């Protein structure tokens, strides 16, 4: 459970997510792990990056920066005495990162254009998303990451971290996200409605059709999921970043 940002976390959100998944027959095979309970692990990971001189302090105001960090603070030493009051950025080691996504094919990101040094510890001392998810996946032995295409641009940053931790990266597989009538991804930030847990079977069938899959004539979530696994055809999933329902 990604709960590393207390200022933005809504009360009851963690339990609601688990209840929504459970209503659709989706339950974890193992006890749920919460990132908020793994802070010490992430600081160990951060120390490993420090030992390799792969991070540096940065106090650049986020609102004034272009989308991809241009490296204003790159020459700062990790031993700078102001280190604990600034954010920490990871120093990317490659001018270009190329990766073959298992579904969308080869993608490339170039330093300065679609790539820049990224935050691994925020100014408020909170651990950043990229570092936490990579370290989680390494410690949990994750070999395949299947996620929405809105996260595909996180891939080069995560590949850099896997390299820094001397670990083979997982296979990445990105599927299209659901877009609203305005062409924007449905999300809580855009005011999208929450999942209706009173119609789980219909929701699952709709999701399968969205992904180009067949859906069985059943009202039981267990049967729908079992059929979906058996009949899964990854080649039928649209090779798109997003599409409307």
Q: Where would I find each of the regions flagged by the language model?
A:
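Active-site cores that bind ATP or allylic diphosphates and position pyrophosphate for catalysis
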Residues: 57-197, 215, 245
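Non-catalytic terminal extensions that flank enzyme cores
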Residues: 93-95, 184-245
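Short alpha-helical "patches" and their helix-cap loops
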Residues: 1-10, 174-176, 217-227, 244
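Short alpha-helical interface elements
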Residues: 14, 24, 42-46, 156-159, ...
């Amino acid at each position: 459970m990604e709960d590393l940002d207390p200022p933005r976390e809504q009360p009851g959100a963690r339990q609601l997510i688990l209840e929504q998944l459970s209503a659709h027959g989706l339950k974890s095979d193992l006890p749920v792990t919460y990132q908020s309970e793994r802070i010490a692990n992430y600081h160990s990971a951060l120390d490993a990056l420090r030992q390799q001189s792969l991070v540096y302090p940065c106090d650049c105001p986020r609102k004034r920066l272009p989308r991809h960090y241009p490296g204003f603070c790159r020459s700062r030493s990790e031993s700078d005495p102001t280190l604990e009051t600034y954010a920490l950025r990871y120093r990317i080691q490659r001018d270009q990162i190329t990766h073959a996504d298992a579904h969308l094919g080869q993608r490339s990101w170039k330093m300065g254009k679609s790539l820049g040094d990224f935050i691994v510890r925020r100014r408020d001392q909170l651990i950043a998303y990229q570092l936490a998810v990579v370290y989680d996946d390494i410690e949990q032995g994750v070999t395949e990451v299947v996620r929405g295409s809105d996260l595909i641009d996180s891939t080069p940053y995560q590949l850099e971290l896997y390299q820094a931790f001397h670990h083979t990266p997982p296979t990445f597989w990105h599927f299209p996200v659901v877009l609203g009538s305005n062409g924007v991804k449905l999300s809580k930030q855009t005011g999208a409605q929450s999942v209706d847990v009173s119609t789980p079977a219909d929701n699952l069938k709709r999701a399968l059709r969205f992904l180009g899959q067949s859906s069985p004539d059943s009202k039981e979530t267990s049967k729908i999921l079992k059929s979906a696994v058996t009949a899964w055809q990854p080649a039928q999933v649209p090779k798109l970043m997003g599409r409307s329902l």
